[in-house]
């Protein structure tokens, strides 16, 4: 499965490391979704410069040259790497096209603290799942969570294009999601529980 979930602060294994500051362009053959949890950094993406700080979301398309120009000492990011093959395997070309449009028109955006926490919880869950033994159910669960993660990015970016204050604009779906996630975390369910529900 062409997906990896990692960060730059916990020592998680990385299959594409772009965190060093050396002024040299890096290029990944996959989509990178980056969420800034702390600190700030300046990214050079092709010929444009983007600055992100806590609560900012950044999408970098596959085969796009970029590098980190500078970052603060407390710069923490969550990263999701999604290979193009995942979109074809999950039969979700609509999501792929929406992401391509957003990357071209609005690759970065600020999100509310509630959304930031939601993304971090999804990221943490996926990081654990990717360490589990791979099978049909695990892969299905990961696929669906990745789609939620990326569709939510589309939702946020679409919503805030015309919203006067994006950090105050919340939807009922977000509240419902938090309630469900909190319930699952409190009961500490195992992978087998999810598999039995699907199967």
Please name every model-derived segment.
Residues 32-35, 118-125, 145, 149-152:
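Amphipathic, well-ordered alpha-helical segments in soluble domains
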Residues 2-5, 69-132:
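A hydrophobic/aromatic-rich effector-binding and dimerization subdomain
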Residues 110-112, 133-141, 153-198:
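Short, Lys/Arg-enriched, Trp-marked, Pro/Gly-tolerant hinge/linker segments that flank
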Residues 95, 117-122, 148, 172, ...:
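Generic alpha-helical secondary structure signal
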Residues 36-38, 61, 71:
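A short, compositionally biased micro-patch
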Residues 1-53:
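Generic protein-terminus/edge-of-domain signal
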